[in-house]
Amino acid sequence: MTIHIYNTLTRQKEEFIPLEENKVKMYVCGPTVYNYIHIGNARPPMVFDTVRRYLEYKGYDVQYVSNFTDVDDKLIKAANELGEDVPTIADRFVEAYFEDVTALGCKHATVHPRVTENMDIIIEFIQELVNKGYAYESEGDVYFRTKEFEGYGKLSHQPIADLRHGARIEVGEKKQDPLDFALWKAAKEGEIFWESPWGQGRPGWHIECSAMARKYLGDTIDIHAGGQDLAFPHHENEIAQSEALTGKTFARYWMHNGYININNEKMSKSLGNFILVHDIIKQYDPQLIRFFMLSVHYRHPINFSEELLQSTNNGLERIKTAYGNLKHRMESSTDLTDHNEKWLADLEKFQTAFEEAMNDDFNTANAITELYNVANHANQYLLEEHTSTVVIEAYVKQLETLFDILGLELAQEELLDEEIEALIQKRIEARKNRDFALSDQIRDDLKDRNIILEDTAQGTRWKRG
């Protein structure tokens, strides 16, 4: 089975064929580290970590690079407001980023380059563009000359004349064309700066990724990925810079994930409806958040609400409960061989369907459907009077493998005796208040955690299943 990827560049699904056999070069745009990331910022790391995990599962050696922009207008503004220097703020939020995405199940990239640690190659890249006539200096700034790059607009699929007409920035004294963009910005008084052939300053945003991608992955990479909002102008400008310099294709497959809405409204700081990962992982299990994010195809928008999160949690708990029941039954199973082939053949079908979903542009939504199928099938098997260790182990291994591909964990924390007693007391109060819906919900939730309740004349007794 071959993998097909929807390529933003061609607007169609294409068979994935890496430049080098069994090797994948992948670049994912990382955050500007001036604050904690919100859940919209967290979607790309989770999505493309899953892509990476699946490629590795299929036998590819994935070189995965994701950068940190640690000098930027937003960082400078934050430094001025807080009375701290830019490096201090950047270091703090790099650490916070790692804490957040690690909690969400993301592995570290092969390399996490920082702009400030690669200033020499960025300046060299800009100088080469100037030498080739693709860039020009203007009063200490350096701009990319878009009209010189014939393919400008090919990622956003817009003619350059239309892009120029819709450009927000008018031609100023420094720029020759509205679409020209900054490669180097002259430092303002009091700003952090680096020495360059054009004076003191710092790089523009777009050039940073081009330079670091080239340094760590070469002139042409297999997959370049990021949020949908980066397609234009960021990724469009990366293509222009890189291909103008090398004359080679910059990236062969472009992947972009969709937006996140909050309660059916677009998430934005202006509306004040954004949710920081730093906060939400204190309210909800980070694994649930990842499972929720992967329950929707990465190119589609996600509507984020507590109701949907709770519904997703119920599904995740069903799978975890099935897994726990399998592990528990393993001890009492035998080497029974009757009917083994039938159950194992069904498991093979689920595995194939899971891989077919992932091969189809990493459709995690359909892949998760197969997790539910495995769990339901396992529950049916556990109704058998006699169960086989071979089949039980196959179920357990399959669930563990598929969860690992998605960056998820199956371990379910065991409830403490005191927690169980507290829930039973809450159920007793609910029954006194004739809130039978809540009473039943508590009983069912405990059952899902392998806690069996028995109501007697002497009170409610419980035992672990």
Swiss-Prot record:
Organism: Bacillus cereus (strain 03BB102)
Reactions mediated catalytically: tRNA(Cys) + L-cysteine + ATP = L-cysteinyl-tRNA(Cys) + AMP + diphosphate
Gene Ontology CC annotations of this record: cytosol
Record-listed ATP binding positions: 269
Cofactor binding, per record: Binds 1 zinc ion per subunit.
Subunit details: Monomer.
Cofactor section: Zn(2+)
Protein's recorded name: Cysteine--tRNA ligase
Family the entry assigns: Belongs to the class-I aminoacyl-tRNA synthetase family.
Lineage: Bacteria, Bacillati, Bacillota, Bacilli, Bacillales
Gene3D superfamilies (UniProt xref): Cysteine-tRNA ligase, C-terminal anti-codon recognition domain (1.20.120.1910), HUPs (3.40.50.620)
